[in-house]
Amino acid sequence: MNLRTVALAGAVGLVLADSSIVVLALPEIFRQFDTSISGVSWVLIIFNLVLALLAVPAAHLARRFGPGRSAAVGLAFFAGGSLVCGLATGLGPLLTGRAVQAAGGAVAVVGALELMVSTFGDNRRAVATWVGAGAIGAAVGPGLGGLLTELVSWQSIFLVQVPVAIVAGVPLR
């Protein structure tokens, strides 16, 4: 497996881990921002909603601008959104950051799939790698989020993603 494939799998895993990484941090966010349960639930909802809604438009972007460039730009937006989340001082900025993360994540994940298909030349192997990376990310997300929240802070679950997204995006340019 070459560096580009590892970066692609890492990008998919990172984005899909983020779909669930906040679950165990929600009580801390709820307390810190003194918000309602429905308000704090949007921290989880907005990410998954935007990610799902932008998947098809992201595929059009990947075809128009190329999957490598799209995936790298998507990861840059994901990193920027993660930074906004990690520095958020209220629920509004946190939700904005989550929406930006998801928009970037949608573009990155779709671009990664197209790059994997072209890299492997075998759709089944590419899709299996893509799905496997996503499943691992989604499975690791809650535990990692809970650990970081307990040991450091809820903000750390977002701030740690910034350098990871940047490093994953470099080989994709």
What are these language model-derived features?
Residues 1-172:
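Transmembrane-helix bundle of Major Facilitator Superfamily
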